Swiss-Prot record:
It holds the Pfam family Ribosomal_S4. This is Small ribosomal subunit protein uS4c. SMART domains: Ribosomal_S4, S4. GO terms for biological process: ribosomal small subunit biogenesis; translation. One of its GO terms (molecular function) is structural constituent of ribosome. Part of the 30S ribosomal subunit. Contacts protein S5. The interaction surface between S4 and S5 is involved in control of translational fidelity. It is found in: Plastid, Chloroplast. The gene is rps4. NCBIfam families: PRK05327.1, rpsD_bact. Keywords: Chloroplast, Plastid, Ribonucleoprotein, Ribosomal protein, RNA-binding, rRNA-binding. Its main location: plastid. Belongs to the universal ribosomal protein uS4 family. InterPro entries: Ribosomal_uS4 (IPR022801), Ribosomal_uS4_bac-type (IPR005709), Ribosomal_uS4_CS (IPR018079), Ribosomal_uS4_N (IPR001912), S4_RNA-bd (IPR002942), S4_RNA-bd_sf (IPR036986). One of its GO terms (cellular component) is chloroplast.
Length: 201
């Protein structure tokens, strides 16, 4: 299944706020109206919607998300929490959380077009897994820096999560540590996502 490129508001109206996909928010009460017209959700549908929420927020294909679930399942610790850590430490998501892009798809474009360096080297793979002490910088090029400066100016001021530091004037971000669960930027029940996949096998 390919990455979603359809109407974004349609997704957030059904699944709730997906800040990585779009800065728009569903209107207050729209979910309640939808629920009043529909029958009670099955457990399968509840798990499916949590999975879809994760997939659309981080901009993943079904195959990519399944791969991350399998990696998380083999790691030590809670599969759900490891899954969120893997997704949050992707380079495209780190740029989004730093405010260098308004959405994750926008961050992905910055990476694909060679505007971003990690530890002094251009990285053009959005799924690159960042590690503690990684230094993310914008290429020392007028076009790259003007582009990112415009995005920084456009982004709503939000408190940075503890695992990141931003040096705006140097166009530089620092990964301090692996993200804590409480700093994940999406309202999600990751256990339902793990359950969804465990029941598919």
């Amino acid at each position: 299944m390919s990455r979603y490129r359809g109407p974004r508001f349609k997704k957030i109206r059904r699944l709730g706020a997906l800040p990585g996909l779009t800065s728009k928010r569903p209107k207050a009460g729209s979910d309640l109206r939808n629920q009043s017209r529909s029958v009670k959700k099955s457990q399968y549908r509840i798990r499916l919607e949590e999975k879809q929420k994760l997939r659309f927020h981080y901009g993943l294909t079904e195959r990519q998300l399944l791969k991350y679930v399998r990696i998380a399942g083999k790691a030590k610790g809670s599969t759900g929490q490891v899954l969120l850590q893997l997704l949050e430490m992707r380079l495209d998501n780190i740029l989004f959380r730093l405010g260098m892009a308004l959405t994750i798809p926008q961050a992905r474009q910055l990476v694909n077009h060679g505007h971003i360096l990690v530890n002094g080297r251009i990285v053009d793979i959005p799924s690159y897994r960042c590690k503690p002490r990684d230094i993310i910088t914008v290429k020392d090029d007028q076009n790259s820096r003007t582009l990112v400066q415009n995005l920084l100016d456009s982004s709503a001021p939000e408190e940075l999560p503890n695992h990141l530091t931003l040096h705006t004037f140097q166009y530089e971000g620092l990964v301090n540590q692996i993200i804590d669960r409480k700093c994940v930027g999406l309202k999600i029940n990751e256990l339902l996502v793990v359950e969804y996949y465990s029941r598919q096998t």
